């Protein structure tokens, strides 16, 4: 019976209404203690729109944010930041699906590029970082280490025609020890 009493008190504190943020953006939806809390929609002064969950006046939980320029994020939020699993649709038709940390692509994720290229791997502050595989639309691929959005460390570049390089990379260039294997069966070690 105590549980029912707590639920009733909580249910009575939720109201449906409007809230204007200090920047002039307007929220409509569930309000608790005078702030957005629960499901609602915010229309921002710049034309952006967010529909989803709020907690204590901040985007928190699942939501969809549509930018005025046509970009869109669908996913998890934590204290007004993209945080957790989400999908971002870029205006140039790239699409990222993966983990976010404080508004950055961070952790495991996949980027589908507008030209048909695909990257599957780790991200750090919106840059490819750590281990990942980049597959070009023409069939070539790179499987290896990344740093600051560039091939860096050990990796294998396969041209998709029987030629491949296995070795060290530095800032997107072959650097250090490596082996070039030709489609003819020849091999160059250097």
Where are the predicted features?
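N-terminal segments that cap or nucleate solenoid repeat domains
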Residues: 11-49
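One face of beta-strands
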Residues: 15-17, 40, 63, 86, ...
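Leucine-rich solenoid repeat scaffolds
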Residues: 17, 185-190
């Amino acid at each position: 019976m105590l549980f029912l009493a707590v639920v009733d008190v909580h249910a009575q504190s939720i109201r449906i209404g409007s809230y204007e943020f200090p920047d002039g953006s307007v929220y409509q939806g569930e309000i608790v203690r005078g702030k957005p809390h629960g499901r609602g929609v915010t229309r921002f002064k710049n034309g952006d729109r967010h529909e989803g969950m709020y907690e204590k006046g901040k985007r928190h939980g699942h939501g969809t944010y549509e930018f005025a320029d046509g970009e869109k994020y669908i996913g998890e939020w934590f204290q007004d930041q993209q945080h957790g699993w989400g999908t971002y649709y870029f205006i140039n038709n790239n699409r990222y699906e993966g983990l976010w940390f404080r508004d950055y692509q961070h952790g495991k994720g996949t980027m589908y590029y507008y030209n048909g290229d695909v990257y599957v791997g780790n991200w750090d502050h919106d840059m490819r970082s750590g281990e990942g595989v980049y597959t070009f639309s023409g069939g070539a691929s790179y499987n290896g280490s990344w740093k600051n959005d560039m091939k860096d460390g050990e990796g294998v570049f396969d041209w998709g025609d029987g030629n491949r390089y296995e070795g060290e990379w530095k800032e997107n260039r072959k650097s250090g020890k490596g082996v070039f294997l030709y489609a003819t069966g020849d091999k160059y070690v250097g």
